[in-house]
Curated annotation (Swiss-Prot), chains A, B, C, D:
Domain remark in the UniProt entry: Has three domains with a flexible linker between the domains II and III and assumes an 'L' shape. Domain III is highly mobile and contacts RuvB.
Region (Domain III): 139-190
Keyword Manganese annotated: no
Name of the featured protein: Holliday junction branch migration complex subunit RuvA
Function field: The RuvA-RuvB-RuvC complex processes Holliday junction (HJ) DNA during genetic recombination and DNA repair, while the RuvA-RuvB complex plays an important role in the rescue of blocked DNA replication forks via replication fork reversal (RFR). RuvA specifically binds to HJ cruciform DNA, conferring on it an open structure. The RuvB hexamer acts as an ATP-dependent pump, pulling dsDNA into and through the RuvAB complex. HJ branch migration allows RuvC to scan DNA until it finds its consensus sequence, where it cleaves and resolves the cruciform DNA.
InterPro entries: DNA_helicase_Holl-junc_RuvA_I, Hlx-hairpin-Hlx_DNA-bd_motif, NA-bd_OB-fold, RuvA, RuvA_2-like, RuvA_C, RuvA_C_sf
Cell location: Cytoplasm
Main subcellular location: cytoplasm
Length: 190, 190, 190, 190
């Protein structure tokens, strides 16, 4: 629901900022390593994730939408809540985390406060499944269409097989989507 | 609660846009077939439906309020959640869907990802009951008054019977409502 | 949380309006008898009540804050939800409802759609307890202080007894509150 | 989520104000002793706490962020909800409350409406544990870093031990955080 807040930074704490737009000051939780890049009284854009629980509504914020997207993937993993996800991103940035996953570097993962060896192994397993979708398959357009087909309920393998056959960066998005849908609809014997 | 958002489109993905008003960027899920009509950096009005769950608040958006109304009718059908409803509207627009219902075209309905033959039949049944209310009975004013009487708790048959007797497009809305209510209150032996 | 919305009326239906402020159009449910006093394209102030349920957030709106306050009292009565409360206020305005209560006019109460004789009797009983607090005891200041003392947890009888002793419209609110609290704290043997 | 509202005060009641920003009037519950410092039609900044329940969203407001922070600590104590916390802060301001805790003054605590002797003793016990964190350990920067380390999951003793070793007000926040995290990560044998 809430993609970003653009406003004036009012306060900066190691793990929280207050950013104002209109007459409202929003308090936003941030990864500790990010606070040094945010300055009081400056106009800033924070990419946000609205976390709704039965008795709380909180906003988590990031300087890049790709880091916010990674945060939203992390909290889909069973056992990783917003607090643990922000700990992970407080300790390592996105690129470092990819390397840790690629090198199966359990030791670095378990340096994150609150993460023991067993949790580190489970996170490694789950992140391996997610990270490809967070690194561009081919390019942004290909990825956007693939994720739309997955959201429609098609399996990754099925969607990629069709997309790889017809994908060509010259074609516009709408054409590629229409072609994929008609092949996929046909493939399902519908 | 949220009828529309008027703002500048920041990003357009096949199934999602980000639209900004004030300092806030709202992320809005849209039917895939609609994204080709939305352009980045353009001032746009999106008719919205706020979907509140225990652990999420999401916004679904449409270029026409009638399509948003159809979406809100679809999600009242048991077994059809927002995701399935957006799949239906990603595959077919409103007019096509009416034809499919009128011609009891199960084959086309089951082309929608995630919808098998059995679900298609059930949707057909339920949609037949809803669609009349989404196509104008006589005209907008007649429909608005009828839906207000239904919301007050009167049965469709009872309300239509009274409305058909006294309805005349020349009369203003308040008069028609007052007359219907007094007849309906009288008819209930109250 | 949401006391009022000031904005331009975009659409008026018998039981619903859309009012815009900033780039957001809010959809607000209203009593049917009120829609005739609201005109499209006019700047209007609507006094609101935000109704939060597990799977919905809705706004109910009124042209006067006293009618909104009555609505919020009605929905505190067991068995009366927002829909029934808006039916009551769609059928009768505040003054008429007071007369109905004063004259114990069950017949008029049960003319409200969805309200049978038994419910009418129960509403009558409960409304008798509430209405005094909605009609000014003495004046607005007296009522505001009385309701603040009740919110603090003091019984109506206890609070009125103290307030009646020290109340004088010439004194300012803060002084009256301080004097009442010190007497009440003393009376509790604290 | 909601740190403050800056706007024009529309109404002031003993325990509630309405403050407007943009076209929205927000109703905010305040401690009774604070209302005398708030004037109608004046531009005011209210530090807020958004209280989300299954069937309500309410805003509690304070003239100082430190009083709001104390309110948010109080409601973490089992058995103290927002209503009781606002009663406590309606009866005593922050400084007086500190003295009451320091002097273990049960009598004053139980003067708060709704608080008997037993609850007073329990509150005393719990507040003793919280108050140090609300009074500056050394200075604002030291406190912000300490609370960030606690939020990351480190124990207070462990975090304070490391922070006391390396803390020096000349160093900037980012450096102190980086140094503490590397020592803490090392200390955990990670």
């Amino acid at each position: 629901m809430l993609d970003f807040i653009k406003g004036k930074v009012i306060t900066v704490k190691p793990d929280k900022i207050v950013i104002q737009t209109g007459g409202i000051g929003y308090s936003v939780k941030i990864p500790i390593r990010v606070s040094r890049y945010i300055n009081r009284d400056e106009e800033t854009q924070i990419f946000t994730s609205l976390i709704v629980k039965e008795e709380s509504i909180e906003i988590y914020g990031f300087l890049e939408s790709s880091e916010r997207d990674l945060f939203e993937e992390l909290i889909k993993i069973a056992g990783i809540g917003p607090k643990m996800a922000i700990n992970i991103l407080s300790t390592y940035d996105r690129e470092t985390l990819y390397k840790i996953i690629d090198h199966e570097d359990i030791k670095s993962l378990s340096k994150i406060p609150g993460i023991g060896k067993k949790t580190a192994q489970r996170i490694l397993l789950e992140l391996r499944g997610i990270l490809p979708s967070l690194q561009y398959e081919k390019d942004q357009k290909y990825d956007d269409i693939l994720s739309a087909l997955l959201n429609l309920g098609y399996k990754r393998l099925e969607a990629k097989e069709v997309l790889d056959k017809i994908y060509n960066n010259e074609k516009d998005e709408a054409t590629i989507i229409r072609e994929s849908l008609s092949i996929l609809a046909g493939k399902d014997g519908k």
